[in-house]
Amino acid sequence: MIHFFPTFSKGAKNSPFAKELAALGVPHRLFPGEVILRYHARIWLLLLGWPKVTKFAISSAIRSLILSKPYPDTVVVGSHIEVIIFGIFRALLFRKRPNIVLLGFIFTHRPQPLANWLRGLYFRFVFSIADQAICHSSLEVERYKEIFKSSRTRFEYIPYGLHISVDADPSEEQRTLEKKNFPDAGDYILSAGRSGRDYATLFKAVAPLPIALHVVCDSEFALSGLEVPANVLLLRNCYDKAYVQELKNALFVVIPLQVNDISAGQMVLIQAMAFSKPAIITRTPTVEEYVTEGVDSILVKRGDVVELREAIQRLLSDQGFKEKLGAHANATYKSKFCMKAYVTNLIGALQKP
């Protein structure tokens, strides 16, 4: 019996994730909740977000490990806080099971040596509890095996995957900003995301081009100190259906990455593929596990303004190539990164001896 604790919606029992689990016939239960962690600054995540996660984790552990029957063999959680809470309950109940699995682990370095050391110490403690951690690149698996070599945790790689709804309406903020900044709004390209982004390079690349760029990013840090060109529209509160609308109507997607040693950009990349949108993305070892240059995407050198600008110009001028990339991207999504593929890969990793 596997217990899952999705935090994206209280109605997760009827989600595509739940339906694919049911289709596989794997004994499982879902204990859903809605824990929204959308904050412009990291301090609010620490002060407001993590207490929400802690409350959800305690409630989930009680429902899963005490109130439910039969008890689970495995629990799959989405945060380090949940690992600790479930580990405490497992110890207090004098049980060897369930196995505790951390899904979607990413370990980012901090520029301050002390902060880096403290985070390393903290996660060594987390991995003295967790039995398994799922990562979304093989590079990270090898890296974490080395960093946390004395831990009890088994690190596994599975590709990221998702389902995205095609039903979407623009937000009021989106309508107002577009009307104010682009009264004759027409074609635009889209960039989105906050983690590991290199918007400085992207802004320099698009500044002289005759095309609008919409950037969906709610992080103050990711955009701090940047000069925003006149043809760039920032959407800081664009989520859910409004974000999908932005994606659906874009000519194509550009994902500039600053990091090359962790998973970054895959979510937006796969969302673009689901809508048959070609993507220009920074070439990194993790990205190259998901797409192929010239087949379903264009890969560019990190920090190279000229190469990025030329890639954008190519997709703007070559309609046939753009359509071919989009079609191949959608085929790749359906075969490798849709919800069915993701759930199949996840269950396969959980069931490994």
Feature-to-residue mapping (PLM):
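Donor nucleotide-sugar binding/catalytic pocket of nucleotide-sugar-dependent glycosyltransferases
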Residues: 131-145, 150-172, 185
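Short acidic/histidine- and often glycine-rich active-site loop of Leloir-type glycosyltransferases
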Residues: 224-225, 284-294, 298-299
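Conserved acidic donor-binding segment of nucleotide-sugar-dependent glycosyltransferases
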Residues: 293-294, 298-305, 314-320
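Membrane-proximal helix-turn-helix segments that form the acceptor-binding/catalytic region
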Residues: 62-70, 95, 114-133
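Nucleotide-activated donor-binding/catalytic signature segment of Leloir-type glycosyltransferases, i.e.
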Residues: 217, 223-247
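Conserved donor-binding/catalytic core segment of Leloir-type glycosyltransferases
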Residues: 181-197, 203-214
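A short, well-ordered alpha-helix in the C-terminal region of glycosyltransferases
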Residues: 307, 314, 321-336, 342-348
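Acidic donor-binding loop of glycosyltransferase active sites
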Residues: 247-264, 277-278
